[in-house]
């Protein structure tokens, strides 16, 4: 990969944690991508983010979306940004975030 996280950004949003885990597992097995974050959006929605080369991210997101659909009605959205603009990078949640419990 050309940078620490790669070039492309792949996103899958799910209803519930189980479809998100299934999608993350399928994405990392399907292609050479790095799982960089998962976000608990609220209301039971979870977003999983991967980075890597464009072709790998495309294959990973397709595999993750297919796996998520096999779990049930969990897939909300799947999207790929081939080359996110540098101004977008600070907005992305690229750490391991978790809900604030304080």
Curated annotation (Swiss-Prot):
Belongs to the bacterial microcompartments protein family. CsoS1 subfamily. Induction: Induced by growth in low levels of dissolved inorganic carbon (at protein level). GO terms for cellular component: carboxysome. One of shell proteins of the carboxysome, a polyhedral inclusion where RuBisCO (ribulose bisphosphate carboxylase, ccbL-ccbS) is sequestered. Assembles into hexamers which make sheets that form the facets of the polyhedral carboxysome. The shell probably limits the diffusion of CO(2) into and out of the carboxysome. It comes from the Bacteria. Homohexamer with a small central pore. Residues 8-93 form the BMC domain. This is Carboxysome shell protein CsoS1C. InterPro entries: Bact_microcomp_CS, BMC_dom, BMC_shell, CcmK-like_sf, CcmK/CsoS1_BMC. It is found in: Carboxysome. The keyword Cytoplasm does not apply. GO terms for biological process: carbon fixation. The tight homohexamer forms a small pore which is positively charged. It comes from Hydrogenovibrio crunogenus (strain DSM 25203 / XCL-2) (Thiomicrospira crunogena). Keywords: Bacterial microcompartment, Carbon dioxide fixation, Carboxysome. The gene is csoS1C. The keyword Nucleotide-binding does not apply.
């Amino acid at each position: 990969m050309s940078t620490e996280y790669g070039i492309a950004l792949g996103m899958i949003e799910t209803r519930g944690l189980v479809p998100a885990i299934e999608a993350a597992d399928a994405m990392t097995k399907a292609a050479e991508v790095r799982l960089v974050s998962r976000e608990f959006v609220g209301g039971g929605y979870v977003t999983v983010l991967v980075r890597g080369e464009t072709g790998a991210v495309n294959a990973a997101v397709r595999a993750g979306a297919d796996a998520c659909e096999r779990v049930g009605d969990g897939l909300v959205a799947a999207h790929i940004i081939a080359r996110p603009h540098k101004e977008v990078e600070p907005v992305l949640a690229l750490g391991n975030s978790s809900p604030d419990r304080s």
